């Protein structure tokens, strides 16, 4: 007897969000292990997970590759039962994509509203008709593009692939009707009749057991219905997870989806763990009374020939003028660019490089891609939007002369093969950064230029991470909010593998408690599951054909944004082009700084005007580590590296950007490079044995980095030149280095590379360190070209900070949020550099921060209304986009004040309120921010005066009488507001204070505990000195290359101090490290010869509760006696100390309002 065979057609993956209990890859492997003929991925109204299953079929670990059926489970809003839809070929697949797009584009983000009428429209012969010109919005009209523009663009019918518009013929979508567990025979019969009338010969009725004790009777009813309708029945297990062990997790997902708990979910949960992939023998046993239903699965699978290999991508042709080919136009633009960038001519070497690149571009047929990116950059520059390309594209001389990148090929050793390679059959990838405040203009240009049916943003899969997994599992299991919050608060950053027993104990919980243990176990299992789709940060897919015939398109949450269901890895797998239109805050800052310099100093600068070798003052500033606000070098690690590296030229900045990265650090390349740079170690170049090759083969590769590999390009060249990798092996190595997801695959190259290097006589330590560096690049490393692109912005931002600190401070504040530091630190740094900063004031401030008349060497910075938390103001760039789109202006309170002030100065608060007509909430916010000083009112007096005003919208007849009554009322004398309360109020309203720092009012408190200032810590040179220091936590950083070490920056009234927290200390004081706003640190001083000082923490105490003293009136501490001044510092218990009982809960704040006194730290990982 032949062994039974079976194809499972009803697989639900975890891309049916909060329903499926397994990844698509899990199903592929399980189907391979079970020997199934085929598996059909059919997620709920989506194709989001199919590429992952498709890509997994290439996994070498698969002993057997089942056939993959690409489909979707269509769920309707009009009561039609669910239908599995499987296209038989490329044309049918295109119609399915467009059907799903239609449902998604009429619904909100993450939803799909389908009706049976939609099914009729896309299965019948009318499916050949394109969408009408109103397609981009359907029932959700665009809010930023004029309708006439949309119609003109979107009505075009581009030539190319049929995109699913071919006449039906044998191109079919196969339908399987899926009856629910409880069904009415009439409803199923009616649905079958409608489906067969629509798609005769291509309809099945699913026969799925649910293992609830009535399967025999229920399946018999369904067979009778199928026979009466003359459609075949087909077996399926209606699979929810690949293995029974995932049943509990699937129950949790059900509870999360339905917002209930395990105890209350009842029949919404499966009563068993049977809905998993089953082997053919088991399905044959279950359907022994109807084996033909099992055999039907094979006939069904045989009907389907479509695979994702059939998706053939075509570049858009808009950038190509009539009468030219794309390659001809690219070469013409290249010649024009050479004349622009090199007016005195180019060297023979550069000419040969450009010719080589153009030849390879022609061979790979990539000219359209380069022209498309050039077109987008050209538009941005025509609108005075700063932009520059980066990444591997900066290896291209053609990109430079086209104006896409800024890396001069005469300054940097380019490796074009890292960008485009003859051996590599994959599209190039050019990342272009635009001003973050004006990027939307560029994005809407792309929609107008290519049409919304041919352009959309790539998706990003939002995965469960430790915090979200713990919170959702805790809710599903019925844990109280305080328990789940306590567990979640022990997690650092976004990613992680779960919770340790120590973390559970530090949350004040018992890890041996069965419920807590189960919650931790399920949360760990849930980490990495997709939660929902979101739009990518800026990756666009552009096509010559209809994009909605490749992949479904849906609405983003943001108006006028649409995105596809596939992420960047998916489109790489199917070889579709992506253009990255990214946002970079520093470009906004630089442009706004240039505008301020032009407005107030009469000099107009462009990026190209700032020459990186012109100003030695800039390099001297960086050598001192004064880089707050400077692009890429403002982290504590970079600020500590600057005095050690002592950059003196542009290429030093390239190295500075790249050296504080996992690659060089893990490869132990940093210290050898610094020793050689500082003359403490001779510069030597690794070499092979004499008989194995040229002893100087690495000198050309490593010459600029003193014999130490620091960049990805160098690692690749070492693999090729020294380890003798073939071009294909080198390409595989490049791919393994390229992204986070491939960190686990890079190890397979280890033995080959190290073995080849040692076999050729290279030192074993060098060989191992080289590969450790490559593994570091797999986490996060910079290629030389990318570092060079960023180094240009490092220099420009450092130049502005050095030469125009007033404009730099103002531009930084107007570009928030961005960077490492909050406005308080930006303002503090500017004031330390002799820039006067003036408070928000109704008589002088605008919506944005502005520059006022000179005060000494620099202009004064006036804080704008944007600094007031909750105050309405409109960004000028965003407002311009709104007005150009024909939308009404924003409700801009700041603009009202500026307009009223233009008619004359304000004489009183009452007059101000009357002529600005601001709502009372706006007046209260201004008074809270102490913005009425120019009217003779401090914060308390202004708040009192505002509260005396009538409520909003007074009746005209009584307005004058009300005004007279206010004039007659005598002002009550108010006690003076203590300065400490003013500082607290400043931080609560404008997030900074020009009046003082909170710590100066607590200095007497800390002095009794022998706490030194941050300045004393930073200026000490005594290694090993034990000190206590307290400060506001500004930044917490846990770099991936630091092996779990956390770097904290704290601030008091004297400056900042750098704190190092080792992993063992972090585990002991996790709550304090992660949660404290005001922290006391005890430890030892660690001072380097270059003057970099750290306080290495041994104990930490959360002293955030002390902030309550500022708002409640300062409690006077006992006066010190002076008897302990010469005693050795010992570790007596401090307020809130948990040294002897680390599992005890940390001290809590006295009142919830105290949490809001200080802004939260900016945390990075």
UniProtKB/Swiss-Prot annotation:
EC number: 2.7.7.7
Entries under InterPro entries matching the protein: DNA_pol3_alpha_NTPase_dom, DNA_pol3_finger, DnaE2, DnaE2/DnaE/PolC, DNAPol_HHH, NA-bd_OB-fold, NA-bd_OB_tRNA, PHP_dom
Compartment(s) where it occurs, according to its Swiss-Prot or TrEMBL record: Cytoplasm
GO biological process, one term: DNA repair
Region of interest (Disordered), ranges: 1111-1165
GO molecular function: 3'-5' exonuclease activity; DNA-directed DNA polymerase activity; nucleic acid binding
Pfam name, any one: PHP
CDD domains, A to Z: DnaE_OBF, PHP_PolIIIA_DnaE2
Family membership: Belongs to the DNA polymerase type-C family. DnaE2 subfamily.
Name of the molecule in the record: Error-prone DNA polymerase
Organism for this UniProt entry: Rhodopseudomonas palustris (strain HaA2)
């Amino acid at each position: 007897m032949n062994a039974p065979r079976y194809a499972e057609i009803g697989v639900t993956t975890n891309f049916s969000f909060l329903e499926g209990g397994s990844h698509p890859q899990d199903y592929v492997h399980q189907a391979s292990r079970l020997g199934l003929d085929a598996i059909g991925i059919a997620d709920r109204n989506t194709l989001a997970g199919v590429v992952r299953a498709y890509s997994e079929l290439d996994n070498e670990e698969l002993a057997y590759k089942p056939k993959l059926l690409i489909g979707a489970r269509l769920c309707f809003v009009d009561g039609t039962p669910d239908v599995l839809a499987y296209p038989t070929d490329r044309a049918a697949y295109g119609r399915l994509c467009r059907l799903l797009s239609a449902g998604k584009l009429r619904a909100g983000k993450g939803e799909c509203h389908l009706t049976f009428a939609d099914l009729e429209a896309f299965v019948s012969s009318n499916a050949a008709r394109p969408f009408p010109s109103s397609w981009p919005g359907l029932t959700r009209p665009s809010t930023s593009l004029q309708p006439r523009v949309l119609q003109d663009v979107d009505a075009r019918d581009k030539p190319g692939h049929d995109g699913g518009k071919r006449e039906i013929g044998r191109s079919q979508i196969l339908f399987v009707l899926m009856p629910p567990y409880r069904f009415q025979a009439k409803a199923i019969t009616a649905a079958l009749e409608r489906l067969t009338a629509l798609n005769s010969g291509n309809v099945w009725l699913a026969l799925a057991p649910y293992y609830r004790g009535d399967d025999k009777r229920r399946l018999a009813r369904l067979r009778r219905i199928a026979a009466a309708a003359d459609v075949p029945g087909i077996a399926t297990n209606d699979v929810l997870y690949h293995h029974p062990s995932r049943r509990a997790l699937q129950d949790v997902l059900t509870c999360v989806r339905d917002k209930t708990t395990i105890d209350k979910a009842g029949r919404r949960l499966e009563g068993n763990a049977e809905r998993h992939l089953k082997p053919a023998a088991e399905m044959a046993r279950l359907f022994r009374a109807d084996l033909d239903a099992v055999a039907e699965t094979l006939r069904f699978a045989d009907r389907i020939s479509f695979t994702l290999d059939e998706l053939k991508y075509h570049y858009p042709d808009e950038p190509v003028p009539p009468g030219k080919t794309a390659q001809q136009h690219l070469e013409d633009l290249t010649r024009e660019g050479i004349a622009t960038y090199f007016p005195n001519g180019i060297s023979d070497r550069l000419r040969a490089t450009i010719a080589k690149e153009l030849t390879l571009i022609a061979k790979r047929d990539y000219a359209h891609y380069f022209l498309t990116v050039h077109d987008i950059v050209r538009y941005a520059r025509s609108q005075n939007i700063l932009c520059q390309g980066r990444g591997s594209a900066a290896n291209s001389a053609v990109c430079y002369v086209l104006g896409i990148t800024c890396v001069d090929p005469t300054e940097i050793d380019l490796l074009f093969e890292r960008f485009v390679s003859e051996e590599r059959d994959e599209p190039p990838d050019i990342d272009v950064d635009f001003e973050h405040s004006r990027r939307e203009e560029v994005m809407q240009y792309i929609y107008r230029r290519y049409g919304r049916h041919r352009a959309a943003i790539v998706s990003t899969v939002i995965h469960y991470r430790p915090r979200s997994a713990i919170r959702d599992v805790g809710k599903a299991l019925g844990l109280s909010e305080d328990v789940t919050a306590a567990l979640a608060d022990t997690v650092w950053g976004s990613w992680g593998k779960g919770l340790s027993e120590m973390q559970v104990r530090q949350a004040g919980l018992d890890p041996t408690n069965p419920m807590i243990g189960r919650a931790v176990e399920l949360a760990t299992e849930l980490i990495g599951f997709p939660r929902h789709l979101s739009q990518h940060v800026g990756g666009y897919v552009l096509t010559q054909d209809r994009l909605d015939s490749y992949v479904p398109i849906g609405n983003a949450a943001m108006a006028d944004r649409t995105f596809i269901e596939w992420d960047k890895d998916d489109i790489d797998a199917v070889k579709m082009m992506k253009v990255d239109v990214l946002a970079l805050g520093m470009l906004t800052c630089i442009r706004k700084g240039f505008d301020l310099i032009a407005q107030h100093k009469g000099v107009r600068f462009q990026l190209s005007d700032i020459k990186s070798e012109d100003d030695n003052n800039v390099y001297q500033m960086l050598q001192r580590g004064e880089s707050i606000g400077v692009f890429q070098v403002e982290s504590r690690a970079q600020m500590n590296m600057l005095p050690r590296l002592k950059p003196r030229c542009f290429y030093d900045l390239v190295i500075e950007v790249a050296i504080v990265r996992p690659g060089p650090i893990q490869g132990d390349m940093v210290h050898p490079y610094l020793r050689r740079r500082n003359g403490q170690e001779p510069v030597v170049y690794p070499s092979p044995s004499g008989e194995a090759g040229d002893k100087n083969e690495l000198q050309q590769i490593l010459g600029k980095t003193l014999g130490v590999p620091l960049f990805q390009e160098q690692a690749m060249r070492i693999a090729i030149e020294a380890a003798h990798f073939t071009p294909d092996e080198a390409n595989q190595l490049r791919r393994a280095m390229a992204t986070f997801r491939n960190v686990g695959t890079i190890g397979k190259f280890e033995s080959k590379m190290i073995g080849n290097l040692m076999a050729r006589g290279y030192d074993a330590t060098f060989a191992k360190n080289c590969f450790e560096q490559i593994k570091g690049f797999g986490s996060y490393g910079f290629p030389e070209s990318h570092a060079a692109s960023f180094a240009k912005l490092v220099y420009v931002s450092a130049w502005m900070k050095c030469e125009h600190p007033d404009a730099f401070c103002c531009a930084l504040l107007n570009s928030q949020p961005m960077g490492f530091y909050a406005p308080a630190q930006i303002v503090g740094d500017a004031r330390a550099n002799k820039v006067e900063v003036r408070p928000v004031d109704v008589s002088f401030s605008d919506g944005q921060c502005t520059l006022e008349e000179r005060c000494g060497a620099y202009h004064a910075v006036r804080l704008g209304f944007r600094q007031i938390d909750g105050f309405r103001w409109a960004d000028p760039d965003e407002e311009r986009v709104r007005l150009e789109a024909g939308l009404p202006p924003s409700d801009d309170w700041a603009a009202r004040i500026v307009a009223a002030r233009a008619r004359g100065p304000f004489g009183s608060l009452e007059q101000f309120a009357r002529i600005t007509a601001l709502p009372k909430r706006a007046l209260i916010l201004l008074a809270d921010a102490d913005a009425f000083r120019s009217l003779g009112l401090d914060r308390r007096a202004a708040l009192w005066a505002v509260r005396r005003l009538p409520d909003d919208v007074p009746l005209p007849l009584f307005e004058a009488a009300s005004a007279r009554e206010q004039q007659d009322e005598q002002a009550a004398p108010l006690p003076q507001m203590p300065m400490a309360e003013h500082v607290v109020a400043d931080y609560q309203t404008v997030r900074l204070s020009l009046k003082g720092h909170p710590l100066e009012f607590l200095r007497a408190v800390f002095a009794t505990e022998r706490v030194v200032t941050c300045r004393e810590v930073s200026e000490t040179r005594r290694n090993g000195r034990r000190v206590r220091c307290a400060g506001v936590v500004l930044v917490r950083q846990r770099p991936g290359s630091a092996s779990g070490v956390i770097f904290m920056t704290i601030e008091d009234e004297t400056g900042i101090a750098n704190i190092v927290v080792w992993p063992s200390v972090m585990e002991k004081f996790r709550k304090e490290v992660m949660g404290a706003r005001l922290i006391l640190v005890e430890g030892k001083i660690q001072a380097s010869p270059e003057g970099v000082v750290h306080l290495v923490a041994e104990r930490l105490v959360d002293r955030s509760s002390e902030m309550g003293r500022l708002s409640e009136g300062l409690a006077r501490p006992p006066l010190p006696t002076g008897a302990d001044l010469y005693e050795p510092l010992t570790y007596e218990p401090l307020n809130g100390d948990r040294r002897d009982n680390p599992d005890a809960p940390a001290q809590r704040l006295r009142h919830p309002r105290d949490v809001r006194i200080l802004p939260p730290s900016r945390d990075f990982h």
